[in-house]
Amino acid sequence: MNKEKPIAALFDFDGVVVDTEPQYTLFWDEKGKKYHPEIPNFGHHIKGQTLIQIYKQFFREPEGLQDEITRQLLDYELTMHFEYIDGVVDFMKELREKGVKLAIVTSSNDAKMANAYREHPELKTMVDFIVTADRVTHSKPHPECFLLGAEILGVEKDNCIVFEDSFHGIEAGNRAGMKVIGLATTNSAEAIAAKCALVIPDFTDFTFEKMKGVLQ
C-alpha cells in the first residue's frame, strides 16, 4: 500500500451490497429441478457465474431455451427486492468521508441493475462508478472487471481492496493483485477464508480503520 496515494474499495453487488442471493437461489433451483435433476442444489452450484457462463455450461439446448429462461429471469427480477447488507450503507458513507474512491463491480448486466436503481435510486450516488458485465469482455474469475474499476478510479491495484462473497469473485480479486475481504453471506467463512485476507459476516461494526489495516 502506498500511503501517499488514494485508496479504492471495489464492491461486488449481489451478496455484498444487497442480499439477493436467496432469491436467485430459488429461481435457479427451480430451473435445476426441471432441466438438471442430476445436479442437487443447482442454485448454489452456479453461484458467482454470469448468465452467459450458466447458459454455456447447462442450457445449450434445445433452441430457444436460453431466450425463454432470460424472459423468465427478467420477469422474476422485476419482483425482486434489493435489501442492503447490514451496515453497508453506513460503511460506504464513512469511506466517502475519508476520501476513499468507491465502485460497484458486478457480474450483473445493465438491465438487471436498472431494476435495482428503481428501488434504490441513491445507489448511483453512493459510489463513483458501477462496472457491469456489459462493460467487460471476460467474466469473473477473470480479473478484468476489477482492473477496469481500478483504472477508471485512477487507483493503483496495491491500493485497492475488493469485497466479494463468491468463489469466482474472490479469485478475480486475487488475480487482479488486490487484497480481498470476503463476505460470509453466500458461502461459509470456513469455505472462503483461505483465499481472503479477512472474512466478515457483514459490515456491522466494520470501519475504515479496519479496512485500512488489511491494506497495510
Language model region names:
Residues 1-7, 93, 109-110, 115-216:
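Asp-based, Mg2+/Mn2+-dependent phosphohydrolase catalytic module
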Residues 2-44:
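Active-site neighborhood of HAD-like aspartate-dependent phosphohydrolases
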Residues 16, 106-108:
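Conserved phosphate-coupling serine/threonine residues in phosphotransfer and NTP-handling enzymes
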Residues 31-32, 49-63, 116, 150:
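Helix-loop "lid/cap" segments that line or gate small-molecule binding pockets
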Residues 33-38, 64, 97, 121-126, ...:
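Short helix-capping segments at alpha-helix termini
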Residues 56-92, 98:
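Metal-dependent phosphoesterase signature
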Residues 78-83, 107, 176-177:
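Short, flexible loop segments at the rims of nucleotide/cofactor-binding pockets, characterized by
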Residues 98-100, 178:
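Short phosphate-binding/catalytic loops that engage adenosine nucleotides
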